[in-house]
A protein has these predicted regions:
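Auxiliary alpha/beta "docking" domains used to position bulky ligands
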Residues: 2-196, 224, 243
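Iron-sulfur cluster-binding cysteine motifs and their immediate structural context
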Residues: 38, 201-223, 227-243
Length: 243
């Protein structure tokens, strides 16, 4: 769901549509929700990726794997992941603070409409690049896009220059038939990577070190990881340049 889809909020029930409307009202650019589960396929992929040493010196990725693959072990009692996206802005401000500020505002609205018990009172449940959680994969689970050949989340209309943030809540969410269940964009997002990116390899060709080796990313070669900030694989992406 994006800002253009905001509808009037009245007689709120805990549906994905109402949650997303609240997220858009507080200032996010897109929102989706997904039921908590263990991401078995991603766990298998990550374990193999780490075993090959492709994570470089990011040893933290090899820790807390149970929590990383299943948010219910990170926040006991969590049943739903709310994922929000904020557009990238080149202002120099710390996006973590901006995203978390909006998440806390959204949390207050959720408590107001659905009760204090909607979130854990004893465990941290708001995240923005701050916990062992597979953020990009949960964006996909929530219907907010797909993982492109540049290994970034790509939203079908916002592109990949977005910052994700999450709230884990303790209640199940009623799926909306009008939004295709939990995955609002499911009809607009193609079903496989070949359809997503087709024959486009611009990001792979733009990478100055060859770090993008489909279907894996080699952090040891990535300029953004080894030396300095780099967005070459994103700025070249047609989803970020729709014209």
């Amino acid at each position: 769901m994006c800002k253009d889809d905001i509808s009037t909020l009245s007689n709120l029930t805990l549906t994905s549509e109402n949650i997303c409307n609240l997220a858009l009202e507080v200032g996010f650019d897109a929102c989706g929700v997904a039921p908590v589960r263990r991401l078995n396929d991603d766990a298998q992929f990550m374990d193999h990726w780490i075993a090959q040493g492709l994570h470089g010196e990011m040893d933290y990725l090899a820790r807390n794997c149970d929590k990383r693959y299943n948010p219910a072990t990170l926040v006991p009692g969590a049943q739903t992941v709310i994922v929000c996206l904020l557009r990238f802005e080149n202002s120099g401000r710390d996006y973590h603070r901006r995203v978390k500020s909006l998440l806390y505002t959204l949390e207050a609205k959720l408590k107001e409409h659905f009760g204090e018990d909607i979130v854990s009172a004893t465990h941290q449940h708001i995240f923005c690049d701050s916990a062992p959680i597979l953020e990009r994969r949960w964006c996909v689970e929530a219907g907010l896009g797909f993982i492109g050949k540049n290994h970034q989340l790509i939203h079908p209309t916002l592109g990949s220059l977005v910052h994700p943030g999450e709230i884990l809540i303790n209640l199940p969410v009623v799926a909306d038939t009008t939004t295709g269940g939990y995955r609002e964009d499911i009809e607009r997002i193609p079903k496989n990577l070949a359809t997503y990116c087709s024959n486009c390899n611009l990001c792979m060709e733009a990478c100055p070190t060859g770090a993008l080796r489909n279907p894996v990313w080699d952090a040891r070669l990535c300029v953004a990881y080894t030396t300095h900030h780099c967005l070459d694989c994103q700025t070249i992406c047609p989803f970020n340049n729709p014209s």
